[in-house]
Amino acid sequence: HFRDKVRHSPDAIFHNADLYPPQYVRARSVTWMRTDDAVTEPRRLHQGGAGYALERYFVWAITETPLGKWRREYLIDPLLYWRRKVHWRNFEASYDAAELEPASRTRSTYVLQEYFVPVEKFDEFVPKLAEILQRFRVNALNVSVRHAQADPGAVMAWARGDTFAFVLYYKQRTRDNAKNRVAVWTRELIDAAVSVGGCYYLPYQPHATPEQFHAAYPRAKELFAIKRRLDPAFRFRNVLWDKYYAPNLS
């Protein structure tokens, strides 16, 4: 579908597919196309600053009620997409992230992860992803699939060819044992991505082992060499540098 209908279409502006948990066998593909038709939504931008009570209720219900995920897949989303919509491009790009913010993060929180796999490995990666998330009973709200073109120049490029990005948005408890459990299945997902020639997004929680880090980013040693040359005293640092670079200094 993506190759035939979206990838080379000059009118495709935004594209996204959502894999529905907990089975991950069905997806809803949405493509916004360039058109000269009259807009169905006159606003050019979302205003922001609203209470978002309804949006937050649905996020809670999807993750906490017995039929929440089923309702989203078979009732809520079909209603949201049953009418053809014509929006300004900036309107679709200006949603307020606050509508996803929970009322409290004391006992639970929502977290993002992202994995990148070659486009041609989609069918190989998805069953691996599904098996891991199901086995660990990950309370996934959404797995969004997006496309990225190759980035041949960057040393730490995550899109080394035509790439699908799998953006996992999930809910987890804040207890220490819950955090430790997340680290375990995250490392399994990293292995799954690497096994098909992919990698994972670095800026999120540094659960990857040093071996996984270098398997996912085989040119990291080139970056480390630049770091040693430009910052020999290791003054500029963060968690990533401390975990994957600092051990090589001794």
For the regions a protein language model found, what residue spans apply to each?
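Noncatalytic alpha-helical scaffold of FAD-dependent oxidoreductases
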Residues: H1-S250
